């Protein structure tokens, strides 16, 4: 069986946001992703970062195809809801991370199609909600969900 590559790109996203002079914040290690930021996230992950990995794999002699979780409805996402527990006041507070998501369902059909053609899938962890919204998904979370769906 061929490998399936799921990649992140936090430093590359940060670099592009800086170049575009878009401020970014993190809460508990998660990037708050507003409307301007999600466009940059998708551009960097699905574009530059994904294609540089595809190029590296091709240069090693293997065939690969770069996709995102939106392609083939691979990752249907939902908004990630985080709750901050303030231990001093014992009060829970909802944290709005914007367009940060988590996988709701995985349809690995597109992955199986690529593997059947002897191509390594290279996946950017960007998903789409049932509402049509694009969501930024943590790469480790996406990789775990994809692995479970493939029974790997």
Please identify what each model-predicted range represents.
Residues 1-152:
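Nucleotide/pyrophosphate-binding catalytic subdomain
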């Amino acid at each position: 069986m061929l490998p399936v590559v799921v990649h992140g790109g936090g430093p590359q996203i940060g670099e592009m946001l800086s170049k575009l002079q878009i401020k970014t914040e993190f809460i508990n290690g998660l990037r708050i992703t507003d409307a301007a930021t999600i466009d940059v996230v998708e551009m960097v992950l699905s574009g530059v970062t994904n294609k540089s990995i595809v190029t590296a794999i091709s240069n090693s002699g293997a065939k690969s195809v770069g996709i995102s979780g939106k392609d083939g409805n691979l990752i249907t996402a939902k908004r990630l809801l985080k709750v901050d527990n303030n231990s001093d006041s014992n009060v829970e507070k909802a944290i709005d991370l914007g367009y940060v998501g988590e996988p709701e369902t995985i349809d690995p059909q597109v992955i199986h199609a690529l593997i059947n053609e002897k191509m390594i899938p290279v996946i950017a962890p960007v998903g789409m909600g049932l509402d049509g919204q694009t969501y930024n998904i943590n790469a480790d979370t996406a990789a775990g969900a994809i692995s479970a769906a493939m029974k790997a």
